[in-house]
């Protein structure tokens, strides 16, 4: 049967599928657009499962903050071309909004949740794989919330608002002025993106990393042939420098070299006359 061009256009608008696929679907379904939609979905999902095994090395980081809670996630694609695709970007923004709503960091649980279209998150991703033509992989999710305070974030060099290749969210617990807290949290998020700390504080720094670094420094100092007491002081000094490199609260603030992050927070406490606790952060970098 001859397929009307307007029907092909309508089906394309509804599904995002190519002209040839739309024409084939309408021909197979006697011109019925609703049946053709289902046909495309069935055919597309079958193809999508084949594509879902392909390697992904690009993608986007997205953030969504809303008052006292926020989320950040990484969605990977095969190429930067797809990462710049408007449909892919819309999917990623919708996913991070839902991640903030559902407040789960479990990929397995999140994929089972309902997407805004009424399907599951998993099925929506598979549908987008079919339409876009590349594998799409939800790599990780990070969520933060506070009972009283703010969550804010930062994306470096965004492709559009809240989307880029590297980003961070920060949670501050305080009864202080929320607008001023948001400014502080964003400044800290910007610092995190630049300085890339390994941990919030020394007590939560990975012990294996800590022991490995101390062992490396000890071997270096042993070659100096210093007395034991002197050698120990040198080791402690170098470890202090290591902490300043990797522990957020000990890092020198990138916007003011006269302050550490801990001192920055204390200064803001004095200004607001309220206690401020930096309770957590999430830093995501594409494929890191």
Curated annotation (Swiss-Prot):
It comes from Ehrlichia canis (strain Jake). Belongs to the EF-Ts family. One of its GO terms (cellular component) is cytoplasm. Residues 79-82 are annotated as: Involved in Mg(2+) ion dislocation from EF-Tu. Associates with the EF-Tu.GDP complex and induces the exchange of GDP to GTP. It remains bound to the aminoacyl-tRNA.EF-Tu.GTP complex up to the GTP hydrolysis stage on the ribosome. The keyword Protein biosynthesis applies. The keyword Magnesium does not apply. It is found in: Cytoplasm. Its main location: cytoplasm. The lineage of its organism: Bacteria, Pseudomonadati, Pseudomonadota, Alphaproteobacteria, Rickettsiales. Keywords: Cytoplasm, Elongation factor, Protein biosynthesis. It comes from the Bacteria. The gene is tsf. This is Elongation factor Ts.
């Amino acid at each position: 049967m001859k397929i009307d061009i307007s029907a092909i256009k309508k089906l394309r608008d509804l599904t995002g599928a190519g002209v040839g696929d739309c024409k084939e679907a309408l021909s197979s379904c006697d011109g019925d657009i609703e049946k053709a939609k289902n046909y495309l979905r069935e055919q597309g999902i079958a193809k999508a499962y084949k594509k879902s095994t392909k390697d992904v090395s690009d993608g986007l980081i997205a953030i969504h903050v809303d008052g006292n809670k926020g989320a950040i996630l990484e969605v990977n694609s095969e190429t930067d071309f797809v990462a710049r695709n408007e449909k892919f970007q819309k999917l990623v923004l919708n996913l991070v909004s839902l991640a903030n709503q559902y407040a789960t960091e479990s990929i397995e649980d999140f994929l089972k949740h309902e997407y805004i279209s009424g399907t599951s998150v998993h099925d929506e991703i598979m549908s987008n794989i079919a339409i876009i033509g590349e594998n799409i992989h939800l790599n990780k999710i990070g969520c933060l919330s506070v009972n009283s305070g703010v969550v804010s974030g930062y994306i470096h060099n965004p492709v559009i608002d809240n989307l880029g290749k590297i980003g961070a969210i920060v949670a501050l617990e305080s009864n202080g002025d929320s607008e001023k807290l948001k400014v502080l949290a964003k400044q800290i998020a910007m610092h995190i993106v630049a300085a890339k700390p390994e941990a919030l504080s020394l007590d939560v720094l990975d012990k294996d990393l800590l022991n490995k670094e101390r062992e490396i420094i000890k071997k270096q100092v042993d070659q100096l042939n210093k007395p034991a007491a002197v050698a120990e002081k040198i080791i402690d000094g170098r470890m202090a420098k290591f902490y300043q490199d990797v522990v957020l609260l000990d890092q020198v603030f990138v916007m003011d070299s006269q302050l550490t992050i801990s001192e920055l927070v204390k200064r803001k406490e004095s200004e607001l006359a309220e206690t401020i606790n930096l309770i957590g952060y999430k830093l995501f970098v594409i494929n890191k």
